[in-house]
UniProtKB/Swiss-Prot annotation:
This is Cytochrome b6-f complex iron-sulfur subunit. It is found in: Cellular thylakoid membrane. Component of the cytochrome b6-f complex, which mediates electron transfer between photosystem II (PSII) and photosystem I (PSI), cyclic electron flow around PSI, and state transitions. NCBIfam families: Cytb6fFeSPetC (NF045928), PRK13474.1 (NF010001). It comes from the Bacteria. [2Fe-2S] cluster binds at C107, H109, C125, H128. Pfam families: Rieske, TM_PetC. The lineage of its organism: Bacteria, Bacillati, Cyanobacteriota, Cyanophyceae, Synechococcales.
Length: 178
């Protein structure tokens, strides 16, 4: 084996050391700042092997099916916090039944919350006039797409909301929000 002499070993000068230190610091800060951005663009996945995420009321409490049905009449469309905390309409379809889907209340035009207009029997966006029928299908623009939908299920009296991945029954196409 040959031994290297000190003349063969490159030395790191003070300037090169400071450059590497600065580069490492800036890289670390940049990666730390980019992490939340990357998380934002990563699709949400409902955790666990269960039926989804608990729907929450306006106070952040889990929604129970029996409690919801006892305080909301047939045909009622009221908002809960659904997937990702988005406002989602739960629809009471019978004295003891909630529809198997919920309608995301975020307008597909510019993101306004779309209220239900019971007199017109449709969702009407207050921002730019987009209108959606009772299932959330767009009937008048400028919104380009129907409102997103999510599965609604009941397990142990808890209302659960989960991602809709099947064909959109309103349009016959794959869901755009998936």
């Amino acid at each position: 084996m040959t031994q290297m002499t000190t003349a063969d070993v490159p030395s790191m000068g003070r300037r090169q050391f400071m450059n590497l230190l600065t580069f490492g610091t800036v890289t670390g800060v940049a990666l730390g700042a980019l992490y939340p951005v990357a998380q934002y663009f990563t699709p949400y996945r409902a955790g666990g092997g269960g039926g989804g995420t608990n729907a929450k009321d306006e106070l952040g409490n889990n929604v129970s099916a029996s409690g919801w049905l006892s305080t909301h009449p047939v045909g009622d469309r009221s908002l809960v916090q659904g997937l990702k905390g988005d406002p989602t309409y739960l629809i009471v379809e019978g004295e003891d039944a909630i529809t198997s889907y919920g309608i995301n209340a975020i307008c597909t035009h510019l993101g306004c919350v779309v209220p239900w207009n019971s007199g017109a029997n449709k969702y009407m966006c207050p921002c730019h006039g987009s209108q959606y029928d009772s299932t959330g299908k767009v009937v008048r623009g400028p919104a380009p797409l129907s409102l997103a939908i999510a599965h609604v299920s009941i397990e142990d009296d808890q209302v659960l909301v989960s991602q809709w991945t099947e064909t959109d029954f309103r349009t016959g196409t794959d869901p755009w929000w998936g």
